[in-house]
């Protein structure tokens, strides 16, 4: 394709539509979140012709509403998922090397308290294994701290039950910006991403195999067909709607964050601590606010009508 075409320039939208409907792509991706954007860049960088469609804004779903961390998988150690910790840590290191301007180390303070989920020995052992498996190096490696050192770093911690703690590294990002950066980079390799295009139904060849998607333009209500040799469903929570009964139903989960003013909760740095039910919770300063979360509960309502229970908010605040 002509690499001079900028598929993010809305003034040329009619040209984009004409281009993608006149082409048989190698890969068509449904979903413009971080997963779809990553697949788009990977496929395009390998020389494949790629189209990506998104029914709303790019990164409008989970990819703009996360905890803003590239999680290394520390919590998976207690489940003995060592291979997963190694994989997530290695991929995180690659992402940091490729995009250091947007994937940056974030020191996490891990308090150890009486009768808590963690003790000094298990914390030290877990973090050593974590650093090794996740390929953490240099100044980003963990450090065990005494009680006085912990309180010096974070005076808001309660003194009476505190035993000590540790500092380890996660990586923070701007999730929606990272998604957009991946999409923009994929354009450099010739990919054709376009948003406000909704996949309505699959199209089939005479032999009965899927060869494309009939789509609707949400800005004009016009219908169009996009043809492709391979179709990848990267629509996340909307997977069932795309497949329309062709596979087992997804069991969806919901996570929330409480966002408070830093004036009300003025912590010095990010915390990772026990909740009342022994789940681990993050508290992460971002500018003038602090994100507290996240929860993990079964989701049973319509995705366009999100409901947040007061009891779940109280759980995070406690």
Stretches found by the model and what they are:
Residues 1-27, 42-46:
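Extreme N-terminal leader/targeting segments of oxidoreductases
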Residues 30, 130-161, 165-181:
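Short linear elements at protein peripheries
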Residues 32-33, 55:
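Glycine-rich Rossmann-fold phosphate-binding loop(s) that bind the pyrophosphate
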Residues 36:
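N-terminal Rossmann-fold NAD(P) dinucleotide-binding loop
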Residues 42, 53, 101-105, 225-229, ...:
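Active-site substrate-recognition segment that forms the wall
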Residues 45-64:
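Glycine-rich FAD pyrophosphate-binding loop
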Residues 68-153:
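Dinucleotide-binding Rossmann-like beta1-alpha1 core, especially the glycine-rich loop
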Residues 166-225, 229:
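Helical element adjacent to the flavin cofactor pocket in flavoenzyme catalytic cores
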């Amino acid at each position: 394709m002509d690499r001079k075409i900028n598929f993010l320039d809305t003034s040329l939208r009619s040209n984009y539509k004409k281009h993608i409907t006149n082409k048989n792509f190698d890969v068509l991706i449904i979903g413009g979140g971080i997963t779809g954007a990553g697949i788009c860049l990977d496929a395009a960088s390998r020389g494949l012709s790629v189209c990506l469609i998104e029914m709303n804004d790019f990164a409008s779903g989970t990819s703009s509403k996360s905890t803003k961390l590239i999680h290394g998988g520390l919590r998976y150690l207690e489940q003995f998922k060592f291979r997963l910790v190694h994989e997530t840590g290695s991929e995180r290191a690659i992402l940091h090397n490729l995009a250091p301007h947007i994937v940056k180390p974030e020191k996490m303070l891990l308090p150890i308290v009486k009768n808590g989920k963690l003790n000094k020995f298990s914390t030290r052992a877990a973090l050593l294994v974590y650093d090794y498996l996740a390929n953490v190096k240099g100044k980003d490696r963990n450090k065990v701290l005494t009680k006085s050192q912990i309180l010096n770093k974070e005076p808001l911690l309660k003194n009476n039950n505190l035993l000590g703690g540790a500092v380890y590294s996660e990586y923070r990002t701007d999730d929606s910006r990272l998604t957009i950066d991946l999409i923009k980079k994929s354009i450099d390799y010739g990919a054709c991403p376009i948003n406000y295009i909704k996949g309505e139904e699959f199209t089939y060849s005479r032999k009965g195999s899927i060869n494309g998607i009939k789509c609707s333009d949400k800005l004009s209500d016009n219908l169009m067909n996009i043809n492709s040799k391979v179709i990848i469903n990267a629509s996340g929570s909307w997977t069932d709607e795309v497949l329309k009964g062709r596979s087992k139903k997804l069991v969806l989960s919901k996570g929330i964050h409480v966002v408070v003013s830093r004036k009300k909760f003025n912590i010095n740095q990010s915390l990772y601590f026990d909740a009342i039910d022994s789940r681990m919770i993050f508290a992460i300063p971002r500018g003038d606010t602090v994100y507290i979360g996240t929860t993990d509960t079964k989701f049973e309502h319509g995705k366009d009508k999100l409901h947040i229970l007061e009891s779940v908010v109280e759980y995070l605040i406690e």
